[in-house]
Amino acid sequence: MGRAFEYRRAAKEARWDKMSKVFPKLAKAITVAAKDGGCDPDMNPKLRAAIAAAKAENMPKDNIDAAIKRANGKDSADIKTIFYDGKAAHGVQIIVECATDNPTRTVANVKAIFSKNGGEILPSGSLSFMFTRKSVFELEKPSANIEEIELELIDYGLSDIEEDENALFVYGDYANFGTLHEGIEKLNLVVKKASLQYLPNQTVSLDEEQMLEVERLLDKLEDDDDVQAVYTNIE
């Protein structure tokens, strides 16, 4: 996705009430990471990344600890990560990442959002060749030379690096998430966000009117409590 599109989404997230929208999604990401790889952040890079993302949003430590404990609790819900493929107008392709303890509820909600907002849900795996899963790290912009950082991180699985005025973006194969995170930590770089994302192999460009039309669907998807992330091929 293009950086302009990312800015647009970030602006929307900034308007969200953190207590009602952002924190529950971050807590669910922490619980899922802890269930998948264990509750010790030192041994679980995905959990470390989820905690770092929560801290970047000023999520209280008590909330973070509670989310980790939920993964270990005997009565904890069985939260599953599920992906749905869909399409919108103007050639827009969409992958929706959900974390849910009730897949029947979630798929019904996602289907309804697509159908009511000019989109269509597709058979599972329909977009698997249209996107590539990548490890994506957003870092505080460092004072060190970017080329030197790039050379250091290549040995840890770096495939690409980008920078803007406020941040440094580091990309790698999804299988290299742990090793790339290790390299970033060894260089004492500050992680703002870290995740596995689906990035489009080809993008589509929308004008302002088309973007507003598609965003109605994207906004509804992102507002759903079970939706953790929405990936598109918008430039």
Curated annotation (Swiss-Prot):
The keyword Cell inner membrane does not apply. GO terms for cellular component: cytosol. Pfam families: TACO1_YebC_N, Transcrip_reg. Keywords: Cytoplasm, DNA-binding, Transcription, Transcription regulation. The keyword Phosphoprotein does not apply. It is found in: Cytoplasm. GO terms for biological process: regulation of DNA-templated transcription. GO terms for molecular function: DNA binding. It comes from the Bacteria. Belongs to the TACO1 family. This is Probable transcriptional regulatory protein Ccon26_04940. It comes from Campylobacter concisus (strain 13826).
